[in-house]
Amino acid sequence: RGCNFCAIKTGSNTAYNSFDKLPIIEQALTEYGVTNGDYVFTCFGEIDIRNHIGFHLNGKTINEVITLTVDRYMKTILHLKNKGYNVGVYAPPASSVWSFKAYGDVIIRNQMTLSFNKYLKVKCGENNIMVVDISQQMILPNGTTDTKYLVDELHLSQEAMPLLEDAFKTFKK
């Protein structure tokens, strides 16, 4: 059966806790008929950046918490890869300028996003896992996010679709 390219929503989850959500993720993959020939792209990290990393430093630096978060996220990614799926990662996009109750301002969150994605690419590269990342393309020279790519505080607009289509073209069959 397979789904080749389909979106599977498993609820709002964090990269940090994604390994704990593997039963839900695996159930969704089974229900959608995802096979080992299909690509499975994980998409975690935005919530961590917006609401968790900066607020849960506990004496650590932001980069230390980013490293810890990505390392935990990699357990999820590698688990799926070891199950035989063609795993890829869609890295967190640039942060919204309208995020209320979020950590810091958009410039700080975008710096966090770029650091998160840089380390994520290193770890994925070590394991031959593809990463799709449009965050840098969304960020203006002043460090804020170009609002044309945002429809609200959480979702990308249709203006971002050409960026995504271009980034994912490698995987079209």
PLM segments and residue spans:
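Conserved SGNH/GDSL esterase-like catalytic core that processes O-acyl groups on lipids
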Residues: 1-72
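Surface-exposed, active-site-proximal loop segments in enzymatic domains
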Residues: 49-63, 96-105, 145-149
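Substrate-gating cap/lid alpha-helix
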Residues: 97-134, 154, 158-161
